[in-house]
């Protein structure tokens, strides 16, 4: 498989890691979905795959929340990260604001640049990370799932807890150790290990400090400017996508991507589509994730929730952003994240299979959609 990676556009062979069975060089076959239209996929999704998910998404009110996984940096000047971007650039997330479109294109094209080398069986050495115990509102207000009813921002905590509980279990089952990442919630601007950033960039993952960053106002922007349906599960998809980048960083997949290469089959697009698939894999297992004491974090996920997440993927495809947000003609040569159809395909591949080995976007002959 490394040879196939080397031959694919925008790739070079990753360093041999030998730690996780689902790393890029060990991926097997890819799952495919009907390709006739987005509407067709939605019908298949609604009618056959998730009929057992009937009630709306429901966070367990009695679940104790681990706020150490979320750092509320609002009003604190941001996380004390590094200065310049250096060789480790932020990996782009789900989408961007209109104001940040140019920044988005620049950062996205650089996605997956120089990353830390090596990931031994014990996991990569942890950099200095922030903590949710910094006195922010989230740490003060969010103790149980029921607290979401009085402070909507608490929602980010069980989502992050659930995502990391799944990946910790998945890594352990494959004989390795998952290194948790802190989600930094900021307002307008922040400092990171990848350099300073503003809300215009959208949610992103910084490989230099192995953390996720998000201004929660992005969720509202998804609805008002991008036209997404929104909702808890759509918001969860955004964060799960960023944690997909964290997984790629930990297992070495990101090192196979050459910086600055764009296009419909480029390394950047393949990386983003795989992160979408990983987000879907988590979503498939969301109702099985638990707190440290074994209580479920998410009790119910509905068909409407799944449809809202898929709708969000549609709204942040490169073709949608270029034509609907940027008012330009679609130019596939500038794709960095994949088309709406591609993003939907890989998100639903993860949702349907629940298997990270099915998230093969790197093989030479894989059908990206």
Task: Show the residue positions of the predicted features.
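Long amphipathic alpha-helical segments used for membrane anchoring, targeting, substrate engagement
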Residues: 49-141
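Post-HExxH zinc-binding segment in Zn-dependent metallohydrolases
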Residues: 52-54, 58-78, 263-294, 309
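Pan-zinc metallopeptidase signature
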Residues: 59, 317-369
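Short helix/loop segments within enzyme catalytic domains
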Residues: 154, 158-160, 164-166, 170-171, ...
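Active-site recognition of the HExxH zinc-binding catalytic motif
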Residues: 167, 214, 237-250, 276, ...
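Catalytic zinc-binding patch centered on the HExxH motif and its immediate surroundings
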Residues: 189-215
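Short pre-active-site segment immediately N-terminal to the catalytic Zn-binding motif
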Residues: 220-237, 263-269
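Catalytic Zn2+-binding segment of zinc metalloproteases
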Residues: 243-259, 281-282, 286-288
């Amino acid at each position: 498989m490394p040879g196939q990676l080397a031959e694919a556009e925008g790739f070079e062979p990753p360093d041999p890691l030998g730690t996780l069975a689902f790393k890029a060089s060990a991926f097997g076959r890819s799952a495919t979905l009907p390709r006739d239209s987005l509407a067709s996929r939605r019908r298949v999704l609604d009618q056959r795959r998730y009929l057992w998910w009937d009630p709306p998404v429901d966070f367990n009110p009695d679940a104790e929340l681990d706020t150490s996984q979320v750092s509320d940096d609002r009003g604190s000047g941001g996380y004390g990260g590094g200065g310049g971007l250096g060789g480790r650039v932020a990996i782009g997330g789900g989408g961007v604001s209109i104001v940040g479109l140019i920044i988005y294109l620049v950062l996205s094209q650089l996605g997956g640049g120089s990353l830390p080398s090596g990931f031994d069986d014990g996991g990569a050495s942890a950099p200095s990370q922030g903590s949710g115990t910094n006195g922010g509102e989230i740490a003060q207000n969010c103790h149980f799932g029921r607290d979401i009813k009085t402070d909507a921002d608490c929602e980010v905590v069980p989502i992050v807890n659930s995502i990391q509980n799944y990946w910790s279990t998945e890594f352990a089952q494959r004989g390795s150790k998952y290194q948790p990442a802190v989600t930094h919630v900021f307002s307008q601007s922040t400092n990171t290990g990848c350099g300073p950033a503003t809300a215009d960039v959208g949610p992103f993952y910084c490989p230099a400090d192995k953390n996720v960053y998000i201004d929660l106002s992005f969720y509202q922007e998804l609805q008002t400017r991008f036209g997404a349906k929104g909702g808890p599960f759509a918001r969860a998809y955004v964060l799960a996508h960023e944690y997909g980048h964290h997984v790629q960083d930990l297992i070495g997949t990101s090192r196979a991507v050459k910086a600055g290469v764009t296009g419909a089959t480029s390394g950047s697009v393949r990386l983003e589509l795989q992160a979408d698939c990983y987000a879907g894999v988590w979503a498939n297992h969301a109702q099985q994730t638990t707190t440290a004491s074994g209580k479920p974090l998410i009790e119910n996920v509905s068909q409407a929730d799944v449809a809202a997440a898929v709708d969000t993927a549609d709204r942040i495809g490169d073709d949608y952003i270029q034509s609907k947000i940027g008012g330009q003609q679609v130019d596939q040569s500038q794709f960095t994240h994949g088309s709406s159809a591609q993003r939907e395909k890989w998100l639903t591949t993860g949702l349907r299979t629940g298997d990270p080995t099915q998230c093969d976007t790197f093989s030479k002959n894989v059908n990206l959609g």
